[in-house]
Amino acid sequence: ISLKKGNTGMLELVESAIDMLYYNGKMGEIATKHFGSDVTEGVRTVTEEPTLDLSKLSTVEDGKLIIGFEAGYPPMEYTDDSGLEFIGFDVDLAKELGSMFGLEVEFVNTTFDGIFAGLDKGQYDMIIAAVSITPERQEAYEMTEPYISNQLVIVTKK
């Protein structure tokens, strides 16, 4: 999850919420629903119940958690067969965060090429879009610690 640089309070809150989802088993449930197995297992170890300091909540619009993502990357984020409903691991994670923070969740579907520009302009509170952590992104944005482990493979023609 990526947030604007300097939004450290919100980053701490999101980290605590993710830890809470690990602690209560919900993160594993979401992963198993979308991947068929718990791809979060072993990524984080949370042994004590985290607390959420909602005084650190900082959003673009009161009462809403606005999420930037690109709905074309199943099983992370995509649309259902009708094309009207967003579904996927990241969608369910965002909904859980919204519920924990007492906020309505709004999704902004955008192209990945422009997703960080939208965050910079304040069009959404955070990016939840299977963003890889790179040194360049860590320099420019606040980024959560990893919360999912998926394997990448290269496929070639025989």
Where are these regions (language model features)?
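Ligand-binding clefts/hinges and TM-proximal coupling segments of bilobed small-molecule sensing domains
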Residues: 15-58
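A bilobed periplasmic-binding-protein/Venus flytrap-type ligand-binding module shared by bacterial periplasmic
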Residues: 1-17, 152-158
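Extracytoplasmic small-molecule ligand-binding "clamshell" domains
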Residues: 29, 53-54, 60-131
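Solvent-exposed coil/turn segments that connect beta secondary-structure elements
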Residues: 5-6, 35, 70-73, 81, ...
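Extracytoplasmic/secreted cell-surface and envelope-processing proteins
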Residues: 11, 77, 116-117, 136-138
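Soluble non-cytosolic domains of exported or imported proteins
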Residues: 4-12, 21-25, 84-92, 109-113, ...
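Ligand-binding "clamshell"
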Residues: 1-5, 41, 53, 123, ...
